[in-house]
């Protein structure tokens, strides 16, 4: 019971309470904490633990957050121009993959964008399969990307 509440809404808007809001609460061995998020679109927050970096990576609306897993303190916040579709975390990668409708981002633990790829079709599905990031477009096309480099995978 208890724990710190961090409101990250002001990072998104000067009036975050006018937007869609969600709270993410973590109860763990290191204690409890809660973050309050804001989005211009209706979404449900999803998260994955990036254990090698000690971050809980959260996607909500247009934003991805790298939060300290034990405290919820933001390490980085990344905004996309289009809604986020998925995120992928692996101890085999030096970055987290953030998939938006029109772009793929590789974001390092300090929030630096390692690489970015723009897509010509809206991405409707993304899966990490056989060490390839497989993207499905609105038009039905499928594209495979090397998740480490962002280059086309054969």
Q: Residue spans of the language-model regions?
A:
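Short loop/turn segments that connect beta-strands within beta-propeller blades
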Residues: 69-71, 108-112, 146-149
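Acidic, small-residue rich beta-repeat scaffolds with periodic aromatic anchors
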Residues: 125-154
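Aromatic (tryptophan-biased) beta-strands that constitute blades/sheets of beta-rich domains
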Residues: 22-42, 73-80, 112-124, 153-154
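WD40 beta-propeller blade core
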Residues: 65, 105-106, 143
């Amino acid at each position: 019971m208890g724990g710190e509440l961090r409101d990250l809404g002001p990072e998104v808007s000067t009036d975050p309470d006018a937007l869609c809001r969600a709270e993410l609460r973590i109860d763990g061995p290191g204690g409890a904490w809660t973050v309050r998020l804001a989005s211009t679109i209706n979404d449900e927050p999803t998260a994955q633990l990036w254990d090698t970096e000690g971050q809980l990576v959260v996607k909500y609306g247009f934003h991805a957050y790298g939060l300290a897993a034990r405290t919820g303190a933001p390490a980085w916040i990344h905004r996309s121009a289009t809604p986020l579709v998925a995120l992928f975390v692996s101890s085999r990668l030096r970055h987290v993959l953030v998939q938006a409708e029109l772009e793929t981002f590789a974001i390092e633990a300090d929030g630096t964008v390692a690489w970015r790829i723009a897509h010509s079709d809206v991405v409707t599905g993304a899966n990490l399969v056989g060490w390839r990031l497989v993207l499905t477009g609105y038009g039905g096309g499928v594209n495979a990307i090397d998740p480490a480099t962002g280059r086309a995978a054969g």
